[in-house]
């Protein structure tokens, strides 16, 4: 009988990682070869990371403003918690 597995989750670590990426693009360069949006437990975090990937693909620097603009362009900014939440990620660093 399979009662259901709880997927591994460390949402605080996800948030810390995203804050690090937004604050310093070198962090993205270090993890991008291994990390994919679907690796995030929280859908909001997956969307934020995907926005970072899209920015890199477009040769746009990753920072608080560009991530918020990309999320807004994707109609996802409010879903992830708004600009305030994105900003709060960088304050964890």
Predicted segments, located by residue:
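Noncatalytic partner-interaction/assembly domains of nucleic-acid and motor enzyme complexes
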Residues: 1-93
